[in-house]
């Protein structure tokens, strides 16, 4: 088994960041859930949906960064593998959201590099704190992401089945990741940590909708 040096890990981290931040750099491994449905939207509806999907894309950028940061500092090999596998599955979400934004003639958030950097640091710190807290961080993150997705599903125009199919599959995956993290030994995070996570999430949501 190959031993990765600090330089190897640094190069890998840089590669992961580029794949998460550069449009078109990530390809989905699973079929896009929206491929079998159509959606015709008016100008205002399309603009609103683009804002929602931009927020969801930024959320997936954050998820990638969290998992990458946690995988870097996780102590147990099985936990590290869990983080790496979750990141791979989240890549599908990243690609699906980006595809939908292209269909809507819109763009990903200009603030994504900031969200990636913040989330990567938070993930690495969670890993340093210990695997049970790292897994707890995953569980809480996925819980909050699921709440956002459910809210966005309620905001979608009734005729937008393409976005709906994508968000429904994403929500199913997020809940599965949360369950897996808890089953692996994740613990509930301190209240102050959860409040901080919520505040950062709200800031990301409000800004990425427009930028």
From Swiss-Prot:
Binding positions for Fe cation 2? 90, 142, 174, 177
Identify one Gene Ontology CC term for this UniProt entry.
plasma membrane
Which cofactors are named for this entry? Fe cation
Residues that, per the record, bind Fe cation 1: 60, 90, 93, 174
Which EC number(s) are documented for this chain?
1.14.99.60
Q: What is its main location?
A: membrane
**Alphabetical keyword list:** Cell membrane, Iron, Membrane, Metal-binding, Monooxygenase, Oxidoreductase, Ubiquinone biosynthesis
Q: Which GO terms fall under molecular function for this chain's record?
A: 3-demethoxyubiquinol 3-hydroxylase activity; metal ion binding
- Residue spans making up a coiled coil are none
The record's comment on cofactor binding reads: Binds 2 iron ions per subunit.
How is this protein named in the record?
A: 3-demethoxyubiquinol 3-hydroxylase
* Organism, as annotated: Acinetobacter baumannii (strain ATCC 17978 / DSM 105126 / CIP 53.77 / LMG 1025 / NCDC KC755 / 5377)
Gene it is expressed from: coq7
